[in-house]
């Protein structure tokens, strides 16, 4: 099972690095808000040049674990038109 992702955890970088910027107001993983399907990452640059700035939400989350009615975000989940989640908790995991 993939690890749960949280605010501050990294996404796979492409033109510049980015981290999870949004999460649940009341569900926490290791005392950090759990980032869910639809929650954005920090603003970052996307190729090709001139690398326009944008932010993107988690496109897919868990289909069996829900956080405030949204799929819980996990390492490997896709980020809309962008990349994927790269980092998460070392000891909290969420199913498919």
Question: Model-derived features: where do they sit?
Answer:
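Intrinsically disordered, low-complexity proline/glycine-rich segments
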Residues: 2-96
